[in-house]
Amino acid sequence: MKTLLLILGVVAFVYLEPGYTTNCFTCTTWTLSCREFEKCPPDKGTCFKRWNSTGIAIRRRYTRGCAAACPNPVGNEKVFCCVTDNCNK
C-alpha cells in the first residue's frame, strides 16, 4: 500500500506544471474585437481591457493583454482588470 502511494505521489509530481500562468485575450491595436489569446508570463498574471470612454458604446475600440499590475487609465480611458483565464473579453 505504501509503495502504491509513493508511486502515485511521484507520478503526480512529474505531471504537475511548475507554475500556473494566466491566459488573456490580447490585441495591441485598437479594435472592436479580439479573438486571439496569449499565455501570460508568470510575472504578468493580470488580464486587462482598456477602452476610450467617450462617444457611442457601439464605436468603442479596445486593447487587451497581460500586465504585471492593472494599468492606469490615460485621459478618457477606462480600464478593467481581472486574474482568471480569458476574463478580459
UniProtKB/Swiss-Prot annotation:
One cellular component term from this protein's GO annotations in UniProt: extracellular region
A GO MF term: toxin activity
Protein name: Three-finger toxin 3
Keywords per UniProt: Disulfide bond, Secreted, Signal, Toxin
Major subcellular location class: secreted
Disulfide links within the chain: 24-47, 40-66, 70-81, 82-87
InterPro entries: Snake_3FTx, Snake_toxin-like_sf, Snake_toxin_con_site, Toxin_cobra-type
Species: Sistrurus catenatus edwardsii (Desert massasauga)
Domain of life: Eukaryota
Location in or out of the cell: Secreted
Tissue specificity as recorded in UniProt: Expressed by the venom gland.
